[in-house]
Amino acid sequence: MQLPPWRKAVLLSAGLFCITGFASQDARAFDFFGLFGSRDTPPAISPSTVPYALTFQVAGDPDDVERALENASTLYRLRGDAPVDGDALVRRAQADFGPLLDALWGLGYYNANMVFEIGGTVLRIDSDPTAAIRVAESYRNRAVVPVVARVDPGVLFELRDIEVSDARTRRPFSAQELPPRVVKLEPGDPARAADLRAAQARMVDHFRAQSRPLAKAVAIDPVVFHPTRLMDVSYSLDPGPIAPIGNITVTGTQNVDPAVVRSFIYLEPGDPYSPDALADTRKSVGTIQALSSVRIREAETLDEYGRLPIFVEVTERAPRVVGFSARYSTIDGPAVRGYWEHRNLFGGAERLRLEADIFLAPRNDGTRIKRVGDLERSDIGGRFRASFLKPALGGTRNDLLIDGLIERDRTGGDRYGGYTSRLIDGTAFIRHRFSSTFSAQAGFQVQRGQTSDVLGQIDYLVVGTPASLTYDSTDRPLDPTQGFRINASVSPYPEFLGSSVGMVVSRATASTYYALDEDARYILAGRIGLGSITGADLDEIPANFRFFAGGGGSVRGFRYRSLGPIGPLGQVVGGRSLLEASLEARIKITDTIGIVPFIDAGGAFESSFPDFSERIRVSAGLGLRYYTAIGPIRLDIAAPLDRRPGDKPLSLYVSIGQAF
């Protein structure tokens, strides 16, 4: 059974809230943020203008009709801009007849009728406007002109005969050539113009996906029978020939070596033509930080070999950038970050980035910071990172990554303690890109540091050879609606390389995203993370290498890195293994506003593999999303479902991008 969109939203929200035991909240609470807007108020009464208030009265009151009329109406769109006189107001209304009737026909109402009432005076599509102008003027400097659009959509027309033919042969396509699941039109369906156009686009896309790049729509001919309220529609399509990819040309580079751009293009001449492959190419080339835009253009004709030439047109961005950001949560406190970046250091899209973070380090000695005067120098944590990326070594798909880090950190802030760490770290990796979605990297790491917690102080040196695999088939980095993300890493630190503690640290995370509708307004998202440390006892492992759960990227509602095995004095000391998971329902209410009910669970364990000797902690909450061009602004409120003594009942998180 196909559920309407609003039912999907209700069921998704209700399902997660039932799991978490939350009571539903009135959606009007969001009006506190001003994100749903306020009721329309006409401009103030003035001697120089004639403000009006527009109301749509639709017979039968179908919501989709009223929304379509509002979207098509100039009178509605300009309601906040009062006309200078009654004549201008009436001309606005007259200009609306055509677009509003087009909107009604587009919804399948081909016998629709409508009139405007301006101050009670009827204005028809062919009537003399003099009386309406006179009435509108009588309201000047006295009251707002009431304008009513009375609409009778009539009976919804239905489809009868649907024919799709090959423009070359004028014969209908067979079910094998064009499956009914592509057309998605049947006799008895509403004869909506938007549905007819969407079906035409689907059919063209179907043929293009069959390696027919020149597929095109030739004609669509609807015939309306008013007495029977039926429509026949015939399509004419030219599927075009099957053709492979031809020569691929990169244009638009000025200061960036085009060989670097070419290394991010995984298509080769002779490969089967595929719209998805072209979309992947655009996404892959778009990861080059030195570029601001990427456009994939297809030739209009085939070359002499019957192949389709492809043009990758790029635009470079300013090479230098300075940035600043801030984040805050009620548990983990405030943090600020600044960075400087050069995106094309030597002309090969090399990226040098210098980044500094300053944050309030929570105390783990039982004392609290209650006012500014309580701050001590040790309460300020920070990290400085310098990273360098050299893509496409020698024009290959190998990249060089070098990273240096200096950090002072402290976790804790509640009765469960934490740790203090100081470290300096250096890494060098070679990454090989197998495709636009799959890469592997391996390298060398040296880290010297000191950690201190209830288990004692550890001065350490680790020297290792980390390696990792990454697969990412998602469509958008900050707001994915489909695909998978998988990252698996293993970092051996053997003593024969000079490590003071021999161990192997492994970690894997996976997330998936599934859209329940074609417009991706209802998304189910899930994440799972695993970790393991072998080769060393718990008290030999530096505290910052041990696994903890909790925090904005783990189990929301619990303090950052506060979940794990309990050591002396009842303080959390971290574990040698980790298990965490999250489930979200991302529901768009409007194009810019969404809600996200979620549930998180996780824990760390003393053993090298999760044995559930420690309790899995669970939290749940509700998030608000404000969608922008760069990504959603995220506001999450989370609550532990199995609070420990001292845990806060609610936590607030604000950042850019989805939680995972």
Question: How would you describe each model-predicted region?
Answer:
Residues S13-G21:
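Bacterial N-terminal signal peptides
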Residues L308, D517-F598, E606:
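Extracytoplasmic gating/loop element in the C-terminal half of outer-membrane beta-barrel translocons
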Residues Q2-L12:
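Bacterial N-terminal signal peptides that target proteins for export
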Residues I424-A428, I486-Y493, V501-T534:
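Transmembrane beta-barrel strand/turn architecture of Gram-negative outer membrane proteins
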Residues F30-D64, L78-P334, Y339, R353-I358, ...:
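Periplasmic polypeptide-binding modules associated with outer-membrane biogenesis and secretion
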Residues F22-A29:
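Sec/Tat signal peptide C-region and signal peptidase I cleavage site
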Residues A335-R337, T427-R431, Q441, G464-S468, ...:
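One-face residue pattern on beta-strands with alternating periodicity enriched for small/polar residues
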Residues T169-E177, S274-I486, V555-G557, R561-V572, ...:
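Gram-negative/organellar outer-membrane beta-barrel architecture
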